[in-house]
Each structure stands twice: as structure tokens, then as C-alpha cells.
């Protein structure tokens, strides 16, 4: 198998073969991360630039660590202290990094479509530089979708995570789906895997047209939590994106928790071996109760963080010209 994508901008058009390449390569790097010296020279001499125009701790740190574990040189761009504050355009800033000899650009922006604009400019120039979307507006967060997919598959078969493991498995995605780019990427990945995906949330945060989010596929929509949880093997709960909400979308955080917060009692409706995921940061007592948060036998949140490094290593490696491990 040969990786063909120059840019990873979203999962809407990912093929099953591409998902499998990412899962297989991520598993190899997950093993690397358990070694006494968790570093390989595969991207030595490559320059990786993180262009984060939106606050981020987890994603930025995960990408930076992934690049350094691959021995790449990492440049962190800070918009507040850059020429952007002096009137330079985003494209001009990107052109500067291209002229410096960058190999990969990791882009996070509050506006949907910015990574696509940069990728289009790179393609227009005929440059081999790759763009990796680290989250753009309400569009997508592909690396979170891929790490969630890897976490689920690895939980079911740690030695050989693969797409078909999720075939027919009921997975509930709960919460602020309207404002969640994570939900969008997760939906694409899980539907591609053949999972039975259910969406649950308040009507103001889960429009009914999400049922047709994936062309040719109808997703069950639940405005009450219990039907979505019944028999679910996994539950992915989402952070309430209060910074993106209008003031009338939720009566209060307490009311949200009352109707949609995950508690140990509610999780009894699920499969006996249910596991909970959350992209972080978690609002304790809102999306998840503390008892669920503190039970490592119930949630996979720490595994998501660990797997995030391996998955981002895999993508950087593949986009940087690496070969698929046998």
C-alpha cells in the first residue's frame, strides 16, 4: 500500500484503505512509544510548522511531541507575536514558511476552510508541502476522528486494530453536536467502519438534518439520552462549546447534566462492557460525572490522549513519505 494524499483536510472522502493504513501505522508507532527510547529518525531533516490561530493545549502539544518523536524539526507559530499583527495576510505568512523550506504545515483556525485555502495555494504553486488540518471552525477535526477510531479498535483488539472490528457495533455520540467538529469527523470515520452510530442531544444542539449528514446513510437522532444509550458498546460524549453558543441554546449547565450528563447509573443502560470517550477538556459535572471520570475501567480518556500521539506520528510519517509497515 502506498499513501497518496498530500493533504489531510477532513475525513469525508477518506477510503477504507486509508483508514486501515492509518490504523496499521498508528499501531506500529504505539509500540515505539512504549520503548525506553521512544524516538525514531524517520523524519530527520524534515521541518514541521504548527500554525495555530486558535487556542489549544492538547492538540498542539500532541502534534509537537509526535513530530519530535519522529526526529523532525518543529517550528511553532504564534499569531499574537507574528507579522499578522502588523497586517500581513494568512496566505503571505504561509508563503514565508514555504520559502523557508517547510515540509509539513499543521493548521488550526476558528474559521472553517482555512486549511483548504492554504492547501489550494500550495497546489497552485506545485509545491510538495503537505497541509494537515488540526481543526477548522465547525468543519472537521480529522486527527481527533482518527485517534478516536484507533482508540475504539485498539480496545477491541490491541494487537491488530482494524476497521472491521466496529462493524455493527452500536456507538452513541452525545452532546453539543451542532458546534462540534469532532462529532463530524467521528461520524465519518465510524460510518465508514460500519458502526451503528446514534446521535443524542438537546434539540437546540442537534438539528434533525444531522440524520442525513453522511450522504446515502441515515443516522438515528435522539432528543432524549436513554434510547441512544440502550445497548451501546461505546459512548462518545462531547464538550459543550459554550464559546460558540448563543445565550438561549441551553437553560443552564445544571439542566444539561440532568438530562444528558453521563453518570454510572445511566451507563447501566448500555452494553455491560461499555466504555466512554471524550475529546477533552471535560467539564466535570456537566458532560461526565466525577465518578465516571475517575473510573479507568469505565472510560478511555487517557488512552485517547496516548493514542493521539501515535496517530499523529502516523499521519506525519505517511505524509512525509514513509512506507506502510508490513
Curated annotation (Swiss-Prot):
The pathway it acts in is: Pyrimidine metabolism; UMP biosynthesis via de novo pathway; (S)-dihydroorotate from bicarbonate: step 2/3
InterPro entries registered for this protein in UniProt? Asp/Orn_carbamoyltranf_P-bd, Asp/Orn_carbamoylTrfase, Asp/Orn_carbamoylTrfase_sf, Asp_carbamoyltransf, Asp_carbamoyltransf_Asp/Orn-bd
Which positions does UniProt annotate for carbamoyl phosphate binding?
58-59, 108, 141, 144, 280-281
**Enzyme Commission number(s) of this protein:** 2.1.3.2
GO CC annotations on file: cytosol
Q: Which reaction does it catalyse?
A: carbamoyl phosphate + L-aspartate = N-carbamoyl-L-aspartate + phosphate + H(+)
Instruction: Tell me which positions the record assigns to the signal sequence.
Output: none
Looking up Pfam families in the UniProt record yields: OTCace (PF00185), OTCace_N (PF02729)
Q: Which GO terms describe its molecular function?
A: amino acid binding; aspartate carbamoyltransferase activity
Q: Which GO terms describe its biological process?
A: 'de novo' pyrimidine nucleobase biosynthetic process; 'de novo' UMP biosynthetic process; amino acid metabolic process
Q: Determine if Transferase is one of this entry's keywords.
A: yes
Looking at the keywords, is Zinc-finger present? no
Assembly description:
Heterododecamer (2C3:3R2) of six catalytic PyrB chains organized as two trimers (C3), and six regulatory PyrI chains organized as three dimers (R2).
Belongs to which family? Belongs to the aspartate/ornithine carbamoyltransferase superfamily. ATCase family.
Tell me the PANTHER family matching this sequence. Answer: ASPARTATE CARBAMOYLTRANSFERASE (PTHR45753:SF6), ORNITHINE CARBAMOYLTRANSFERASE, MITOCHONDRIAL (PTHR45753)
NCBIfam families, A to Z: asp_carb_tr, PRK00856.1
Its name, as the record gives it, is Aspartate carbamoyltransferase catalytic subunit
Native organism: Synechococcus sp. (strain JA-2-3B'a(2-13)) (Cyanobacteria bacterium Yellowstone B-Prime)
Amino acid at each position: 500500500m502506498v499513501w497518496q494524499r498530500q493533504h489531510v483536510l477532513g475525513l469525508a472522502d477518506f477510503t477504507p484503505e486509508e483508514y486501515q493504513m492509518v490504523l496499521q501505522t498508528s499501531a506500529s508507532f504505539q509500540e515505539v512509544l512504549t520503548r525506553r527510547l521512544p524516538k525514531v529518525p524517520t523524519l530527520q531533516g524534515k521541518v514541521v510548522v504548527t500554525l495555530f490561530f486558535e487556542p489549544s493545549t492538547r492538540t498542539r502539544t500532541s502534534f509537537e511531541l509526535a513530530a519530535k518523536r519522529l526526529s523532525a524539526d518543529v517550528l511553532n507559530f504564534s499569531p499574537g507575536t507574528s507579522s499578522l499583527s502588523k497586517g500581513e495576510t494568512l496566505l503571505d505568512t504561509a508563503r514565508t514558511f514555504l520559502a523557508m523550506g517547510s515540509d509539513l504545515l499543521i493548521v488550526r483556525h476558528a474559521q472553517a476552510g482555512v486549511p483548504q485555502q492554504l492547501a489550494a495555494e500550495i497546489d497552485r504553486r506545485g509545491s510538495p508541502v503537505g497541509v494537515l488540518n488540526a481543526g477548522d471552525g465547525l468543519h472537521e477535526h480529522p486527527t481527533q476522528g482518527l485517534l478516536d477510531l484507533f482508540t475504539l479498535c485498539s480496545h477491541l483488539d490491541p494487537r491488530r486494530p482494524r476497521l472491521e472490528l466496529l462493524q455493527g457495533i452500536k456507538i452513541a455520540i452525545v452532546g453539543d453536536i451542532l458546534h462540534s467538529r469532532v462529532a463530524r469527523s467521528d461520524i465519518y470515520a465510524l460510518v465508514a467502519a460500519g458502526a451503528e452510530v446514534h446521535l443524542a442531544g438537546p434539540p437546540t444542539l442537534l438539528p434533525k438534518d444531522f440524520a442525513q449528514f453522511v450522504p446515502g446513510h441515515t443516522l438515528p437522532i435522539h432528543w432524549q439520552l436513554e434510547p441512544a444509550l440502550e445497548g451501546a458498546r461505546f459512548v462518545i460524549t462531547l464538550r459543550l462549546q459554550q464559546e460558540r453558543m448563543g445565550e438561549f441554546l441551553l437553560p443552564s449547565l445544571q439542566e444539561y447534566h440532568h438530562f444528558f450528563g453521563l453518570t454510572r447509573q445511566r451507563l447501566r443502560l448500555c452494553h455491560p462492557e461499555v466504555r466512554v470517550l471524550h475529546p477533552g477538556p471535560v467539564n466535570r459535572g456537566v458532560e461526565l460525572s466525577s465518578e465516571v471520570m475517575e473510573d479507568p475501567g469505565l472510560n478511555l480518556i487517557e488512552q485517547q490522549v496516548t493514542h493521539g500521539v501515535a496517530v499523529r506520528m502516523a499521519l506525519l510519517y505517511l505524509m512525509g513519505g514513509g512506507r506502510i509497515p508490513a
